[in-house]
Amino acid sequence: KKDQAAVRSGRKPEDVTLMAVTKLHTVDEINEAIDAGATDIGENKVQELLSKYPDVKPVRWHLIGHLQTNKVKQIIDKVVMIHSVDSLHLAQEINKRAGNAGLVMDILIEINVGNEESKTGINAEDLVPLVKEITGSCEHVRVRGVMCIPPYGEAPEESRKYFAETRKLFQELQQLDLPEDRAVIDTLSMGMSSDYEVAVEEGSTIVRVGSAIFGKRNYR
């Protein structure tokens, strides 16, 4: 389905990465998904990532949930990308910890595309100023694009306008003259199990899929 949606959006199937969201799933379930071909997995919580990390087979880990500055140092050498940067303060902490570890961390800026008070992420109008501030001051961070979680809707089609709006913001970033060593704007992380086909049609390059891979979560 992801591949068909990619073709509908005028792209090749390999242009879209399927990320397995492993929140509340066991190490065995995650390893089964890796055996079945999963290359990228996303965790929402730092503690959960750290508890599973030693026993999961080699894979590309992403942090997709809210990240507190005091937890950055715990994951800086374990993830390939942080999808949820929503402040200069957080970006600067990532920059500091990445510098200490001798690496450059890829990040996405999380946009609160529905302006929901209950969600983290920045407002659309703050995106360009924030990216300019980060690329101007953080040499161990590379901005790769944006991530959004649209307001919950009953039907996937309800998310389309939010995905289209996020894609426009992503394209605005691509037009900016940013330092090439600090920004490669190529990643649009949007779409989950319920609406990923619509997200891919609207240009997503990473879809975050949990229940469509693992079945319903085991809420303990």
PLM segments and residue spans:
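Conserved alpha/beta-domain cores
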Residues: K1-S194, V200-E202, F214-K216
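Gly/Pro- and small hydrophobic-enriched strand-loop and loop-to-helix capping segments
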Residues: S204-R220
